[in-house]
Amino acid sequence: MKRAFIMVLDSFGIGATEDADRFGDVGSDTMGHIAEACAKGEADIGRQGPLNLPNLTRLGLVKAHEGSTGKVAAGMDANAEVVGAYAWAHELSSGKDTPSGHWEIAGVPVLFDWGYFSDHENSFPQKLLDKLVERGNLPGYLGNCHSSGTVILDQLGEEHMKTGKPIFYTSADSVFQIACHEETFGLDRLYELCEIAREELTEGGYNIGRVIARPFIGNKPGEFQRTGNRHDLAVEPPAATVLQKLVDEKDGQVVSVGKIADIYANCGITKKVKATGLDALFDATVKEMKEAGDKTIVFTNFVDFDSSWGHRRDIAGYAAGLELFDRRLPELMELVGEDDILILTADHGCDPSWTGTDHTREHIPVLVYGPKVKPGSLGHRETFADIGQTIASYFGTSPMDYGKNML
């Protein structure tokens, strides 16, 4: 029985890439800077001391980071026994966004440039806004700017509740985000508005990667909170991913846990499992791994590393999340059967010590574990697509156009 389990620690980069200067990210290092802060006692909120990741270290994380940066992460053990194969991978795609990273992991790099709304104020074309107001039967809109998702709620959440005007905002990513109150505006109405926005952006040729519904609750600034009912409307990948090939060519199964299905616009997904929060995502993953049959991929995105701690530049929170993940990692490892492979990776960086609130262009870790996987270094990988090609080879699908089999 062959099964592959792919775990994306969303935004867990391990050091700046060779082309980081194009993105203003030279010197960024999500893992290294978290470890450094922990070693200095600067991340002792809700946790204490050096970054403690013994299970990830056994899978080769510290070695992969050392390969990427040329140095051992502060306070971490570079001499621990390694029981998995490890690599550090460069992104071939032109961006440092979620769809690009995930599609490339599945063998389809994004070699075109996404569209962006680069103006920080009055970010969106008036023609687009007028269409949304008309088709969505809206009294108007708020925002129309670049912003952090949590900051904009404190600024405009109350006015939104009073007026019924949705909050439109964007970031350095190729996104159009809509924040609305779950109760006063309504979740279904928000989702409908996002569908309209997706249609208008696609038909208008804006080439925007994702429309994101950002529902929230609460009654006043300081109390507003985003809920787990986020929904991403992505464009479809430009070619068949390894997920699609497994389903089409081998009659296989692909189980999405978390936001994976949204990222791939449901292409190549046979089952969707929603869960919110690190523990709930882990619980759902364990359940799906236990139930997975032959020719199945269980694919989980652990979004909190990015959304709760990376973008919010919360080093202590990110460290605590990593340590929680590490404590629970043996639960996954013990479910890996004789012919199975477990792959732990990321989709980009989001260094919580970095300026601003955006992603960082970094190498990602590629940690591969299984009874038939030979432990040791797989070196520097030129594209995340090596993961997709490895999975294609493993299941015997037709090869991907990009990437090399690592095993």
Swiss-Prot record:
GO annotation, cellular component aspect: cytosol
InterPro entries in the cross-refs: Alkaline_phosphatase_core_sf, DeoB, Metalloenzyme, Phosphopentomutase_DeoB_cap_sf
Residue runs in coiled coils: none
Cofactor binding notes: Binds 2 manganese ions.
Pathway in which the depicted protein is active: Carbohydrate degradation; 2-deoxy-D-ribose 1-phosphate degradation; D-glyceraldehyde 3-phosphate and acetaldehyde from 2-deoxy-alpha-D-ribose 1-phosphate: step 1/2
Described purpose of this protein according to its UniProt entry: Isomerase that catalyzes the conversion of deoxy-ribose 1-phosphate (dRib-1-P) and ribose 1-phosphate (Rib-1-P) to deoxy-ribose 5-phosphate (dRib-5-P) and ribose 5-phosphate (Rib-5-P), respectively.
Protein name, entry field: Phosphopentomutase
Organism: Enterobacter sp. (strain 638)
